[in-house]
Amino acid sequence: MTLDPITCPDGMQQTLGALLYEGLLVLDESFAPQNVLCSRYEHNDDCTSYTFYLRDGVSFSDGSILTASDVLATLRRAQESERYSARFANVASMRASNGALIVNLTRADSAFPALFDIPIVKSGSEKNTVPLGTGPYLFVTDSDGACLKQNPDWHSDGTLPFERIELRAVKDADTASYLFSSREVHLLSADLTSSTGDLRSADTALTDYATANMIYLGFNTQRAPLSDASLRSALAGAIDRATITTGYLAGHAEAAHFPLSPHSSLYPTEMASTLASPDLAAALESAGVTESRPRTVTILVSESDSFKVSIADYLSRTLSTDVLTVSVRSLPWNDYLTALQNGNFDLYLGEVRLTANWDISSLARTGGTLNYGRYADEQCNTLLDAFSLNETDQTARALYRYLAQSAPIAPIAFKTASVLTPSGLIDGLNPTVSSPFYGIEGWTVHFDKG
């Protein structure tokens, strides 16, 4: 199975690839981009054109020098890939020029560099089972089997904690989990809200890290009574996010009132604690839902995710009132998606992997590709544009305050992922959404604990 970071499956291959490949940038704990293969970048006044200058002296694991053409070739493949294509929705053109990559956008995006933590491989090697990368380790097969060894051409001056990393071939995530439990594997990266078993134990260290995966409740804004913005806002405010994150997502999520990670420096924490939602009873009456005219609305959810089905059931119980009954309809994934695309729903429980520039145009802009609720609001479009042009605390607060009031969606939580190791084995573990091995040069390994 290929280790090409553009086309490999999600999961174990990506974890391994984080040691073999690097991007122009990497995202830190707050989703801020840090330079890796580029030394610096600049943009024009309206943030519609970016130039990324490559770092000098970077070579692939075969000793060949990294070029802008290599970067361009990988990004062109990423543009057509299922995993990364959404990041290029705003890209008009890309070209390599004199050791730099020039990217032109269709509209302003002051946070565009946060999208370029895409792993780069040497052009022409992408069809290899293990394409060539610039990362701290390289893949080798010797008399003892497949392993990773330190890349002697790695560009960093940092000291790596392992000379050799043994690899074990596994057929699926369950097998990997078993091997970790039996300590035949010493590091595992996992989404524990999707795990079939509990990998936690007294001798296991678990380090969670923030992701951009948002769980949210979507509203059909074209169908009464949810066409009423005050009612949508009241329902959003009535969601007990703390109970959902701790009780239904096993603690591997963080409550969020706005569509960006609470770890982002732009997250308006103070506004989240002071924002007042409309009174639900008053909002129902204003929307025409009364004792004489009770209503039933239904939450659509995919039956393939037991965590989300449980959350939907909880929402149905806690959002129902004497005059509003909230029911749940679970559907197979394809039927669920078809119903969303056809607008055949009242509410739906969804999950989306946002990009780290926190552009939610697909969800909230008129005609957005994921705007299943047919929300259309010119003021929201204007605020989205202002935020994209200049991501500041001021533009963020203006946008998120308006979204809380008009409530096309109700953010619930951002999931966390987990890195599991034997207790006491590694000090300094600091995984991020870009890499579970972020800052590996700073690790201290206690080999007697393995």
Residue ranges and their predicted role:
Residues 1-45, 76, 132:
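N-terminal lobe/hinge region of extracytoplasmic solute-binding protein
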Residues 140-147, 166-223, 351:
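Extracellular/periplasmic solute-recognition and catalytic clefts
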Residues 222-264, 400-408:
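Periplasmic-binding protein-like
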Residues 287-354:
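Ligand/substrate-recognition segments at binding pockets and active sites
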Residues 422-450:
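Long beta-strand-rich cores associated with HINT superfamily self-processing modules
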Residues 327-336, 361-425, 449-450:
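Extracytoplasmic/peripheral linker and loop segments enriched in polar/acidic and small residues
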Residues 237, 253-287, 305-308:
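Structural transition elements
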